[in-house]
Amino acid sequence: MEVKKYIQENEERFLNELESLIRIPSISAKTEHKADIAACAERWKELLLEAGVDKAEVMPSTGNPLVYAEKIINPDAPTVLVYSHYDVMPAEPLELWNSNPFEMVIKDGRIWARGADDDKGQAMIQAKAFEYVVKNGMLEHNVKFIFEGEEEIGSPSLNAFLKENKELLKADIILVSDTSMLGAELPSLTTGLRGLAYWEVEVTGPNRDLHSGHFGGAVANPINVLCEMIAKMTDENGRITIPGFYDDVEELSKEERDMLASIPFDEEKYKAAIEVNALRGEKGYSTLERNSCRPSFDGCGIWGGYTGEGSKTVLPSKAYAKMSCRLVAHQDHAKISKMFVDYFSSLAPECVKVKITPMHGGQGYVCPITLPAYKAAEAGFEKAFGKKPLAVRRGGSIPIISDFEKILGVKTILMGFGLESDAIHSPNENFSLDIFRKGIEAVVEFHKNYKG
């Protein structure tokens, strides 16, 4: 059966299966969702068995369980390892959602729910493409699946799992759908990702919250001090001020800059979509260069003092912030993390104490476009979307990708189908039904073209 017809005839079932996953709030960041994490893993096991794998199992790790499945056609044939994650980000702030984030809604040609894109929707693309090639006798290579439940918290258990199961996960290429395209009419293959380093900072002043009338102006306010310290992290040119931070940053070649400049990009539409009047970043680089190929520093959260209803004139004892750096290829996240700890600590005046807790991080990644698997993915996009995809680096991070290469010795093809407008990690996450269909078609074509 032709793939478009198969998708059309089975779409209601596909969406019902996706809904069965979305109903499970598999939020890895919250310990109260441990049972949901386990339930989602079990549901994926069932769905992969129904799709045609020979075996599937939920495997324990030092953290959340992983789902492993395989279809072995021939032990001597090439093997594709499909990676995804079944955990999702918290849905807060709930009041900004137009519908229940864990009740899937189909509206305006889009799927609306937490996980609709990241990554339950994109994982379903992989599962249904696999189902099609198996049921139609087109699969000529082995396929393995590994779905984890901790990607949204930095995959803390996956590294050890990879080391302990190298033989089980042995493959010739890894296929991932957890990235985005440049646009619905502008398909693209991700050839690079930024790395990540992340910290939580606690600034302490007095030993208790104080009356701001009695102590204000005489005692340092930790919130004020923390804001001053954060402000010193970048200079007037948008560059990060940590000494030595840029030592390992590889400058973009003229060819790369020319390629990025050739991408159709409307800066006014970009600003309008996120409702900002102007853009800001590192001087000397375009927006597309800044958000994909250059490092960045961001405050991700800041709090302290009284945040309840009404007013309370208080000089707080403590202030907190969460901060991150997106890193580029060749920057080591552990090295950068230590540099940040040393530098940020040095910015603190003697009137406060600073505690810095490094959190999750990961390396950047670059994929050669000469790989046979890349060419197969390229053919898949061209078949489904009617045009050859652009090869672009993206600004997001999937920390485990570099570990795949380091531990398993295998490159990864980042064959993602999301859009910036999908609002992943935000209220009203959504995923285009048209792209969902085309994604299945593209991955089917990948399997038909990949010869190892």
Give the ranges of each region predicted by the language model.
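N-terminal helical capping/dimerization or prosegment-like subdomains
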Residues: 1-94, 318, 335
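Active-site metal-coordination/substrate-binding segment of hydrolases
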Residues: 77-147, 438
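A short core secondary-structure module
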Residues: 216-237
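Acidic, glycine-rich active-site loops and adjacent beta-strand->loop/helix elements
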Residues: 86-88, 110, 146-154, 177-181, ...
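Acidic/histidine-rich catalytic neighborhood of metal-dependent amide-processing enzymes
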Residues: 117-192
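Flexible glycine/proline-rich, aromatic-decorated loop/lid segments
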Residues: 188-204
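An extended, acidic, His-containing surface patch that forms the Zn2+-binding/catalytic region
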Residues: 183-184, 241-318, 326-342, 347, ...
